[in-house]
Amino acid sequence: MTQLTAGKPAPLGASFDGKGVNFTLFSAHAERVELCVFDREGNEYRYDLPAREGDIWHGYLEDGKPGLRYGFRVHGPWQPEYGLRFNPAKLLIDPCALRVDGDVKDDPLFLDGEQQPDPRDSAAIAPRSVVVSDVYDWEGDSSPDIPWGNTVIYEAHVKGLTYLHPAIPKEIRGTYKALGHPVMIAYLKHLGITSLELLPIWHFASEPRLQRLGLTNYWGYNPLAMFALDPRYASHPERARDEFRDAVKALHQAGIEVILDVVLNHSAELDLDGPTLSLRGIDNRSYYWIREDGDYHNWTGCGNTLNLSHPAVAEYAHACLKYWVETFHIDGFRFDLASVMGRTPAFSQQAPLLEAIKNCPVLSRVKLIAEPWDIGEGGYQVGNFPPPFAEWNDHYRDATRRFWLEKSLSLGEFAGRFSASSDVFKRQGRKPFSTVNLVTAHDGFTLRDCVCFNQKHNEANGEENRDGTNNNHSFNHGIEGLGGSQDVIERRRASVHALLTTLLLSQGTPMLLAGDEHGHSQHGNNNAYCQDNPLTWLDWEQANSGLTHFTAALIQLRQRIPALTADTWWEEGDGNVRWLNKDAQPLSAQEWQNGMPCLQILLSDNWLITFNATQDVVEIVLPDGEWRAIPPFAGEDNPVVVAVWHGPAHGVCVFQR
């Protein structure tokens, strides 16, 4: 192979120009950077990157081509007390690699020393970065650009959603291809989903601890290479990018957006006892938040925390997000532990990455959803993200469960959550869509498990049931587990209907966990991050089709009610909402605070939702007018006309006049 010439300092990563490959790498503290390329036999050839502009090291390989496998060895001081941990014995993944080949094994070759750098060479087992030529025919594809007011999000796992679907060809189940299969798209359209939110598909690794237990990181919240698509959901690693883009294109043609759950808060290098794979060896002090003793600030609970207030790291993350929008036509992002994005180290709305996203013409137009917390001091930031971010609303999740399952919530608090949590989000010109309402998510009980289990049952995770939250706000209706008498089963069914009705008819952006609409259970496991097995895969042959139709009818109903699709906050007397007691009278101050958990909500003056969260049948007098119960609470051709509703325990109904 030829020697390197200087090349250019941009863009970051490996760029093929038709004749050769330009390589660039950021490192502020390195003293020397070697590019390591590998031939088909695995032989390694090393070249010093010959040029440096500021903190960008770069070089051009004239005969480099797509498919070339490479990595870096970075030389510099070993001063762990200052956060400097350079060790050229470790082959490092390009942080901007567009493809990575190989998995991270539980192997001591990846580990480094405490006082001295570990001299063992990791190249024999290290994953390889791969040069990619990015050509794809989008055939005029464009984003469905669903208005926030009409958005219904469906949170799903690529494999778990499709792996057991009997109508999808067996050879593509559990893959990107399956997402774009006509059967899956038809199902999402029938359900009324506008936006498919996928759990992480950036190339990720399984933690060594899980590997020793014979488990894997199923969810994917352990990123290895943030520009690289994970190949495990492809028919072949080389086809992953096109197969995923084919799926995005097919979903777009059906009017469905694709949102990615992304992890910009930590990396798969974990704590100082974890593997050295990329960022730690490239520039540990720049990429991570470092304590005064040289260890990591662990505000993520995963061992390390990315320092997104560092200008170069913020630009790296910004470029990554832009890349996914421009190259894969992604319609939005959900940011895991998003408070890290605003740390300076205290949380600030003006943090570099948040400012870059807000001012970016590419990113500011896509959907942006923050998980507004991390585990560090000051990490809980619900309601504090700037526009245009929406946020997961755990207030809503807990309040809705408490109202229906624990009977421990005032009507005032319930109404506040039902009306887009205006006390939390009505600021800085934000709209009602800013709250992403959820009752369940990948993290926690499924909806069915919320009504079947009082306690978590996470023994299969290998931590003696210590992992996962104990604060579930669930109710098993008298017996722990999925079994029970017919009475128990009926009360659980009513509670599920009530929770779904509340979720899908509240103001704000609803998010539905895949499988909740057909009764999926994880048998009480509320932290199934490492369960790549039938516990998490949706069982389509056992799906509760009645519950699926109920959910689809609710979503269809939601889209018909102006008060739920408009981007305006509800105000007293504006005709959007009226709050009534069981006698059709305005709720009194006493009832708001201490009234029985029973109320009527009149939306857009024509739709009436009646809620009875008591244990008894309650006679509810409807307001004046001719009210008809409507689907999914009555047949389309045989609506029930009533003036008084005898609300069963845990009961809900919707009427139209």
Curated annotation (Swiss-Prot):
Pfam families: Alpha-amylase (PF00128), CBM_48 (PF02922), GlgX_C (PF18390). The keyword Kinase does not apply. InterPro entries: GlgX_C, GlgX_Isoamylase_N_E_set, Glyco_hydro_13_cat_dom, Glyco_hydro_13_N, Glyco_hydro_b, Glycogen_debranch_bac, Glycogen_debranch_GlgX, Glycoside_hydrolase_SF. Signal peptide: none annotated. One of its GO terms (biological process) is glycogen catabolic process. Transmembrane segments: none annotated. Keywords: Carbohydrate metabolism, Glycogen metabolism, Glycosidase, Hydrolase. The active site is at 336 (nucleophile), 371 (proton donor). Its EC number is 3.2.1.196. Disulfide bonds: none annotated. One of its GO terms (molecular function) is hydrolase activity, hydrolyzing O-glycosyl compounds. CDD domains: AmyAc_Glg_debranch, E_set_GDE_Isoamylase_N. It is an enzyme of class 3 (hydrolase). Residues 460-479 are annotated as: Disordered. PANTHER family: GLYCOGEN DEBRANCHING ENZYME. Belongs to the glycosyl hydrolase 13 family. Removes maltotriose and maltotetraose chains that are attached by 1,6-alpha-linkage to the limit dextrin main chain, generating a debranched limit dextrin. This is Glycogen debranching enzyme.
